[in-house]
Amino acid sequence: MVTNELSEKIKIYILRILNKQFMYPDEIIENCMEEFGAQINTPNPSLTIKNQLKILSDDKMVAYYHGYKITPKGRKEI
């Protein structure tokens, strides 16, 4: 199970790595798995990270243009 605290850490981590560079979804998932893999206690951790990306996208903090990049709204969060 992923707690709200861990979800927030994943969210901030995604925003920070996207602030550095444009990334494809698989790269984001791979980086998050390296960083948080042992802490995500779900049957499908990569789906958990994909869901977090979707939430960020729905909140207009990241945008998808053949890959993800951070938006000005997302930059304000970090």
Enumerate the predicted regions with their spans.
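General structural signal for alpha-helix termini and helix-helix connectors
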Residues: 16, 20, 34-38, 62
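A short, conserved structural fragment
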Residues: 53-67
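Short, hydrophobic-biased segments on the C-terminal half of alpha helices
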Residues: 46, 50-54
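Short, cationic-aromatic polyanion-contact patches
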Residues: 67-78
